[in-house]
Amino acid sequence: MARMAESKLVAAAPRPGRVAGSFRDPSGQVFHFQDRILRTMDSAAAIEFASAERVMRQLVVEGRLVDFSDAEPSLHQLFQGSIARVLQHPLLEQITYPYEWSFAGLKAAALFHLQLQLDLLDQGFCLSDATAYNVQFEGSRPTFIDHLSIKPYRDGQLWYGHKQFCEQFLVPLLLRSVFDITHHSWYRGNLEGVPSADFVKLLSTRHWFSHKLFMHIILPAKLQSSRTSQTKVDLGDSRARRLPKDAFRAMLAQLYSWISGLKVDVGKQSVWQGYAANNTYTATQRSEKGQYVAEFVAQHKPRTIIDLGCNTGDFSYVALENGAEKAIGFDFDPHALDAAFDRSVQTSKNFLPLYLDARNPSPSQGWGERERQGFSSRFSADAVLALAFEHHLAIAHNVPLAEVVAWVTQVAPKGIIEFVPKEDETVRRMLAGREDIFSDYNEEAFASALSQKARVVRKHLIPGSKRTLYTFERSE
């Protein structure tokens, strides 16, 4: 009777909604249903999955693969067609994309992917593709989410994911390491990474003498160009070509060693890289600000925090040390984000720093304008910190102050916003050499804009400065 009742409840429930980005593999798709993720498989996929299940279970234990279990039989009736097996997974709190990761984060994901490939190969399995979107982060720890891309290894098979790995991991990393160009805008514009053919055009003659660059990027790009420019090219049957297992392993190991050694020029001072040391705050004022954040977290007890303009994460750590369980930081400075990511790795805190240009947040895009969801669809928290943030939009980029306030208050139902007046040295620097057109930029206008969107529950003037911290609770 209990099973019949459960079956009726399931039948009456809303149909599962396919995750918009899950459409490329017809053998299995991913659905969002209530508070979980469901993954369907056809019979062929179910057989392959069963063969790898023991290996996958060990990866779950190691924290390298999202957990899975068989969905209750009653859930099968929610799907049409020949579904052989349905898995359920815990719902990830946050989905992030490679064009939001820092250089350090993308590098960690690349090394994670390669190590996973190497370990699977030792056990007779491999990954069927190399998309970076199959990696997600819990704090700074990468984890794998696509169970059906773990396949039995066939002796001598080619690595069909090589081009994808290079364009979604290697080339974006080289773009920064070689040319000090960040990957974010290029990657987001293309979605599938940075094309090798485009990267090759940036290389000088001396780069052609690099064996690794030539073998992994230059030669494949030239061969691809040759194939597309000729109407008929006899390349032979790819099924007849073989890549011995030892050669496959050596290729993966070479890439791992190469990427491990990639670095950025930390000697190039970026706009906010030295902010923590060179801002207009005194140590006492900074401590006062941290104490205010600590008191806010202790009183309101937010489980999750979004830190806008996080820099290297100081105030995210204050929140985590005072009761918050998870913090996601956003900044547009690449050096600060790399330092923040490395700090998260070293401390093992649940803190993930991500790239965000708040003037132009990640949009919903891709197939049907839904394949990759936008910032506002994916990121929300119990509380938001917007410390030394609003003036960068309102003054540096001419975004109306009221709109800045409205945007920040939509990120979380409560939080702290710091107002930085024109008299502050930082704003004075921003206005130096340009006309001051911001007649309505003042604390009265800020407070009025905030009161239209939320209730101000506390305000605090930082001693020795003209900056004011506002605690708000959004009006629902």
Where are these regions (language model features)?
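Conserved SAM-binding motif I beta-strand of class I
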Residues: 326-331
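Catalytic activation segment of kinase domains across protein kinase-like and atypical kinase folds
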Residues: 126, 131-177
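Conserved beta-strand signature within the Rossmann-like core of class I S-adenosyl-L-methionine
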Residues: 407, 411-421
